[in-house]
Amino acid sequence: MKMTCILCNGMLDEYSKESNLDLSINHCKNCNLYISGNTKQEVIEKVSELYKGDYWNEHNSETSINSEYTDVDSQGKRRNWVSQFLYTKQYITGKTLLEIGVGAGQSILWFEEEGFDVSGIEPDGRNVSMINKVLKRGKVAETSVEGFSSDKVFDVIWMSHVLEHLIEPVRFLKKIRNNLKKNGIFFIEVPNCEYEPMLQSSIEKNPHLYHFTKKALTKMVEEIGYKIVSCGIFRPATKSEGMRHKILKNSFPYYPRIMTDVHSGRDLRIILKNS
């Protein structure tokens, strides 16, 4: 059966016949959400094919871990994480943290170094084994994101550039609410696909199943029952802004990322609480 919008159940218009996953891209004008594929079964088959191939070999964390996260990729992620943490820390009231999609393990280690009691999930068993050797107290479990199940509750749930990869993001966001403490926060960052260059990158260069705009993401989380604490669009700082920041320390509160508008920012961030 042809897919409809996961938010309003409305009909979709074809946006593009091509994508990184060789799936067509469809668009809901009502929700401003871009969706990969024409049927759920088609999407499941493409994702299964992707992860059975060389995907995990190409995303191995060994280089990053062996460099103690001094490699170029990790340093770029460090700059983004610093900004994310500055954006969220005023809302954090406890120290238990669950990271959804640990990747190479940079963020979960940096949170542990900040004194958090960290847990994480990651589908690549090789990465999990290496990351667990780096963490002093924290633990990463090998499981798919959508297959995750736990009775534990956390002060912070952290999900950076993972939601766009899920087959059923609404179902996942409903389920993970049970793992968030009453006064806890849920941080999500995704590509800002209202910014045209990022939309094209999300479609053409990455195996993303959903391509979110601010309207689509906020509608999704509110309909599930989350309360939006903060939502913003961010871009990397320019060199001149970096110089200004060195002189005037309080110029950019989330440096080295700068808050901007939906048509010029790379990343879309949202902080949620259970309503």
Functional labels for PLM-detected ranges:
Residues 1-160, 170-173, 232-236, 242, ...:
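Conserved N-terminal segment of class I S-adenosyl-L-methionine
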Residues 66-68, 197-206, 245-251:
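Short glycine/proline- and charge-enriched loop/turn segments
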Residues 161-165:
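A short His-aromatic
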Residues 167-171, 198:
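Short N-terminal helix/helix-N-cap motif within the alpha/beta-hydrolase-1
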Residues 170-185:
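A short glycine-rich, Lys/Arg-flanked "PGG" loop and its adjoining helix->strand segment in the class I
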Residues 187-220, 236:
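Short, glycine-/aromatic-enriched active-site segment of Class I SAM-dependent methyltransferases
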